[in-house]
Amino acid sequence: ARLGLFPLQWTAALQDKLDTRLADVSLSVPEERHAEAPIWFSGAAAKNIHLLLDDTGLQALFSNLLKCAIDRDRQGKVHPAFIKIIEALSPDDARFLSLHSAIEPLKEELTSQVRNPMRELIRRRIPELDELPQAAIDASIDNLRGLSVVHSSVSNIVGLDRGSVTRVELKLNQFGRNFCEVCLPDSTDDDL
């Protein structure tokens, strides 16, 4: 009998967790600034409400997006694609994006020959990612590029007085900066 009731108990526990998180979102926006979320946002948010139950780091991004969507003063910053971006991120992608945005843009001029200039740039500028396998970092960069959040460039400059130089850069584009401003943890709490 207990096993038969498990699905109902589990569903009730999820509902309680969801209710708590939605209440937290609502309470974080001053009452005088509360607004109904745009209709184009509400449907997509409802389809992806599972992101609010995620405990891998994506929950904070979705929660901040919801805060902006119901905040009259910040609604204009919300873009329909932000939900899809969060849905397409791995926890490693979210962590990489958070660390990258804090020291944006990443730029280096490498005078020594390195096999993978982008990897060297990340190794030098974001040492917090050293514990991640290089394949995970490469996948995160590729995914963020594919989502049109970051732009990267690698160019070789020959003939300078110090020999050949490889200029490598990874930066958020304007869309990526907007996404970070709206969705990254603590970015929406500063002006509440």
Set out the residue ranges of the language-model regions.
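Short, amphipathic alpha-helical interaction segments positioned at domain boundaries
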Residues: 161-192
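Short amphipathic alpha-helical interaction segments
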Residues: 36-42, 127-158, 165-167
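Charged, alpha-helical interface segments at or near domain boundaries
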Residues: 1-89
